[in-house]
Design a protein with these regions (language model features):
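Extended catalytic cores of very large enzyme megasubunits
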Residues: 1-172
Length: 172
């Protein structure tokens, strides 16, 4: 059993991290579904950190914010029109994050999601990471076909039909 302890003045972030650790401690051969509980708890923590709440932002808002902060290439925002960003936003299936296990979410938030490596602040969620990899890869493809490529590639990587090497995932 997990032993959760709180103290006066504990922050909501500390409570969330305690719950994540408690879920991870409960993962076993007899109770394997706690791997999904832990993954979802990490997802909720990420959403609060990135969006300030549970509801994801429009993709263009996230790209603009992270471009201004210096974490995304400034050229990306100009490669797509507002109409294309709106279409790309419809491709994103944020509920796919609910299928990620504790270990997968820890890998993503520890190694692959865009973050400040000094402060540890994270600037995107897994589905935003996946769609932005696709949008970056196909930004110079012909306008007539590139959104279809973005959608198909996003679906393939976000559904884990294909896996990406670390340099691509880490934004190298």
């Amino acid at each position: 059993k997990s032993q959760i302890q709180f103290h006066n003045g504990v922050t909501s972030k500390e409570i969330q991290e305690t719950l994540i650790k408690a879920a991870a401690d409960l993962i076993s051969a007899e109770t394997p579904n706690y791997q999904y509980v832990g993954g979802r708890l990490i997802n909720y923590a990420l959403r609060k950190e990135v969006y300030g709440g549970f509801e994801p932002w429009h993709i263009k808002k996230l790209v603009e914010k992270n471009t201004v902060a210096g974490f995304y290439d400034a050229e990306l925002i100009t490669k797509y029109t507002d109409e294309e960003w709106n279409k790309i936003n419809t491709f994103i299936k944020h509920d796919r994050d609910d299928e990620l296990t504790y270990v997968a979410m820890e890998q993503l938030r520890g190694k692959y999601l865009c973050q400040n490596r000094v402060s540890g602040e994270i600037f995107e969620t897994p589905q935003m990471c996946y769609i932005l990899i696709a949008a970056s890869l196909f930004q110079d493809y012909p306008i007539e076909t590139r959104l279809q490529w973005v959608k198909e590639y996003y679906d393939a990587i976000s559904l884990h039909d294909i896996s990406l090497p670390t340099p691509v995932m880490a934004g190298v």
